[in-house]
Regions:
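C-terminal catalytic/acceptor-binding lobe
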Residues: 4, 177-291
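Short loop/turn segments at strand-loop or loop-helix junctions that form parts
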Residues: 11-27, 64, 150, 219
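Short amphipathic alpha-helices and their capping/turn segments at secondary-structure boundaries
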Residues: 1-11
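Short, acidic, metal-binding catalytic loop of nucleotide-sugar glycosyltransferases
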Residues: 29-33, 44-56, 82
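Conserved catalytic core of nucleotide-sugar-dependent glycosyltransferases
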Residues: 95-110, 127-205
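Acidic metal-phosphate-binding loop of nucleotide-sugar-dependent transferases
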Residues: 123-125
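Active-site-proximal specificity loops/subdomain of glycosyltransferases
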Residues: 23-31, 36, 61-116
């Protein structure tokens, strides 16, 4: 049980530094790497929750209990500055992680026996009304349903002041993926398994009417996340922030993201276009126009 928490009907989880994910990976406590991740979390993920217009939620950061004391002090400082934020230090074992999820029930303020849990990565962000949107589903009719905002804004920094942004539609994305549960059969969203299978394993509510979505950063360390540069739009920093403000994503900063150099590659599509005779291109267009 996590003592002294402000309880709420909506609780989020961030798997920040427990060393049981993806097998052998980089040391999360290596000084430069720690600093890089910490700044992105503080200026992107955490700031997006500071901007929520509904503050009736709790965000739990799951850490390794082996985190160095000076690093712990920095997270505890963030906790003191943000009433919704709590650090949970656990052993580097799956059993300890599972116990933390089970014990999180003590930190839920059930509303008519119903609550919602959600997940987010430590380098992504949600729109300012994310919690408010989830609050509409704290009803018994939705118990057992997952909730997804399928639109994503993928951001990659390519120069000091320039960014690529790609809008993407992905129903089972992990940015704010949520699950409606109850007191009798409490289950968290992290117990549903891999997020990309959630829409196969549970009935899912897609908030498609929203003109907004979450931000996924491409920052050089999240190798699983990718961007299709051919579908991205170039923005300078000021333009990017203005665009995201229209999507109710405000006050976050991307100037900690690493810069991706332009790849010295030519796409397969461009290569093939060099070898296709013009007459075949014309015929292809005519065939397409018939369907």
């Amino acid at each position: 049980m996590i003592e002294g928490l402000n309880k709420a009907p909506i609780v989020g989880f961030v798997r920040y530094s427990q060393k049981i994910t993806f097998g052998i990976e980089r040391d999360v406590f290596e000084p430069n790497y720690f600093e890089y991740r910490f700044n992105i979390f503080k200026n992107v993920t955490l700031e997006s929750f500071r901007q929520q217009n509904n503050q009736n939620f709790v965000l739990l950061l799951l850490h390794s209990e082996n985190m160095p004391s000076d690093y712990k002090a920095r997270f505890l400082k963030l906790e003191n500055e943000n009433k919704f934020l709590y650090n949970v230090f656990v052993k580097d074992t799956q059993k300890s992680f599972d116990e933390a999820l089970i014990n999180s029930v003590h930190n839920i303020d059930f509303l008519n026996n119903v609550a919602i849990t959600f997940r987010i990565d430590n380098d992504d962000a949600v729109q300012n009304d994310f919690i408010q949107q989830l609050s509409h589903f704290i009803k018994s009719d939705f118990v057992g349903f997952s909730i997804s905002i399928p639109k994503q804004y993928i951001v990659k920094r390519i120069t000091e002041d320039d960014y690529l942004l790609q809008e993407n539609y992905y129903p089972a994305n992990s940015i704010g993926l949520a699950y409606v549960t109850n007191k009798e059969n409490y289950k968290t969203v992290l117990e549903l398994g891999q997020h990309h299978l959630t829409n196969e394993n549970t009935p899912m509510v897609l908030l498609e009417n929203s003109n907004k979505g979450g931000v996924m950063t491409i920052n050089g360390e999240n190798a699983i996340n990718t961007m299709d540069d051919t579908k991205a739009i170039l923005y300078n920093e000021k333009e990017l922030y203005k665009y995201l403000e229209q999507k109710k994503i405000t006050n976050i900063r991307f100037d900690d993201l690493r810069i991706f150099k332009k790849e010295n590659r030519v796409s397969l599509k461009k290569i093939l276009s060099l070898f296709i005779p013009p007459i075949l291109k014309i015929l292809t267009l005519k065939v397409k126009s018939l369907f």
